[in-house]
Amino acid sequence: MDKFTTLEGVAAPLKIINVDTDMIIPKQYLKTIKRTGLGKGLFSEQRYNDDGSENPDFILNKPAYRNAKILVAGDNFGCGSSREHAPWALLDFGIRCVISTSFGDIFYNNCFKNGVLPIRVSQADLDKLFDDAERGSNATVTIDLPAQEIRGPDGGTVKFEIDPFRKHCLINGLDDIGLTLEKKASIDSYEDKAKTERAWA
């Protein structure tokens, strides 16, 4: 998993509440267990028309937001069924941070496990970030994870809270496998001791 320290880029404003995981990545994309290639399915029912052409009105199809790294979204983002493909699709598209007032619990946890930072802010702060994001490619937003701070294009800042353990994992690029490997020396020591003390086992 790639480390996350600071992220600077365009933020796309998605002013829709209750975006569920089926909207993020429709069910037809769930057949694969590969984490790559899912970016094309991100919001596919909104991004594409029935004939496969792009919907020019959808935010991520607008020229200013095609390379967005940050998504500013409405309340209760990622609600609905459990599907780890949702953060996979965001990440494969290039989005590493989602900002909202609240998230679906399972989606929220899955984001951390896959290197995507979900940030909870107040409604007042979200409204300000929407205003910043609507400036398009002229507005760059910076996410500073060590400082737990969002910096807008006008220099304004928004502080956010994050669990210290999850912060440690993101900064050091540690997924579940990485966390296990971080304890490898202790695991090896325990196994060597167990072999000596319980040779009969």
Swiss-Prot record:
One of its GO terms (cellular component) is 3-isopropylmalate dehydratase complex. Its EC number is 4.2.1.33. Pathway: Amino-acid biosynthesis; L-leucine biosynthesis; L-leucine from 3-methyl-2-oxobutanoate: step 2/4. SUPFAM superfamilies: LeuD/IlvD-like. It is an enzyme of class 4 (lyase). One of its GO terms (molecular function) is 3-isopropylmalate dehydratase activity. Heterodimer of LeuC and LeuD. Catalyzes the isomerization between 2-isopropylmalate and 3-isopropylmalate, via the formation of 2-isopropylmaleate. This is 3-isopropylmalate dehydratase small subunit. It comes from Rhodopseudomonas palustris (strain BisB5). The lineage of its organism: Bacteria, Pseudomonadati, Pseudomonadota, Alphaproteobacteria, Hyphomicrobiales. The gene is leuD.
